[in-house]
Regions:
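Nucleotide/phosphate-binding catalytic cleft detector across ATP-hydrolyzing
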Residues: 1-16, 20-75, 80-206, 224-226, ...
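Glycine-rich phosphate-binding loop of actin/hexokinase-like ATP-binding domains
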Residues: 203-241
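Active-site core segments that coordinate phosphate-bearing ligands/cofactors
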Residues: 244
């Protein structure tokens, strides 16, 4: 993708779908080309419950944004957050025996974590991997300790996964809309990047998002989302309970 190619993002929701088209200019500034907020149908807590209704709603949202921007998207980024999301943390260890740490050492630990995750639950698909700690001889490194001499290396990471069938249904909706999903993005992660500054993301922060049908909690540290959970309880449930 070229620097100035239009980029599309759609955020799934219970009430509305939000679509944004923008581009990154040569001076690295972003320019919004169009936005669209349209009614959501066939989607509950970002899970597709009716393929036909969801396809029609998403087609309308993307089409409205494309018409405003006077362009046609081939790919789009999808922002969503399901109560079925799983957050799994791993700490993998490797002996270095006084040698330098190389990139392939870190890649080995990452592959080992992914392998264990898949063995534990083959029905999950990975949408995010966050590297948040490297521990070299008992000392914490915030960045990759490439070329550092060490006896041991531990790599701490967090995986965000979603049930494969949930993902298949989302993919099918966008296939029916004749558009390819470029990337799947956690809504909690996007909120953290938007609302928290670098210091807050580095030192540690908690973010709670009260939605209409769900509540999401994200814990951030070392510039990573280290824990995330979404509950199928929202402001709608709270309001209904109070009114009784």
């Amino acid at each position: 993708m070229n620097l100035e190619d239009p980029i599309g993002i759609i955020e799934l929701g219970n009430v509305n779908l939000k679509c944004l088209i923008f581009q990154i200019n040569k001076n690295n500034s972003s320019e919004i080309l169009s936005t669209a907020i349209t009614p959501s149908e066939g989607i509950h807590n970002d899970v597709v419950v009716n393929l036909t209704k969801a396809s029609n709603a998403i087609r309308l949202s993307i089409g409205t944004a494309e018409k405003k921007a006077k362009i046609s998207l081939k790919k789009i980024n999808v922002v969503f957050e399901q109560p079925d999301f799983l957050c799994t943390k791993f700490s993998k260890h490797k002996k270095i025996d006084g040698s330098k740490i190389h990139r392939h050492d870190i890649e080995f630990l990452l592959k080992e974590a992914k392998k264990q995750l898949i063995l534990n639950d083959k029905n999950q698909s990975i949408i995010h991997i966050f590297n948040h700690n490297y521990i070299v001889d008992g000392k914490i490194f915030m960045e990759e300790p490439i070329d550092v001499f060490a006896d041991s290396l531990s790599h701490e990471m967090t995986f965000i996964t979603v049930p494969k069938n949930n993902l298949k249904n989302i993919n099918q909706v966008f296939i029916d809309c004749d558009i390819e999903i470029e990337r799947l993005i956690s809504h909690t992660f996007t909120l953290g990047v938007k609302l928290l500054n670098v210091r807050e993301l580095q030192l540690g922060s908690a973010l709670i998002n009260l939605g209409y049908k769900k509540i999401s909690l994200g814990l951030f540290k070392n510039l990573a989302l280290v824990h995330s959970v979404t509950l199928p309880i929202g402001t709608d449930h709270i309001t209904n309970d109070i009114s009784k």
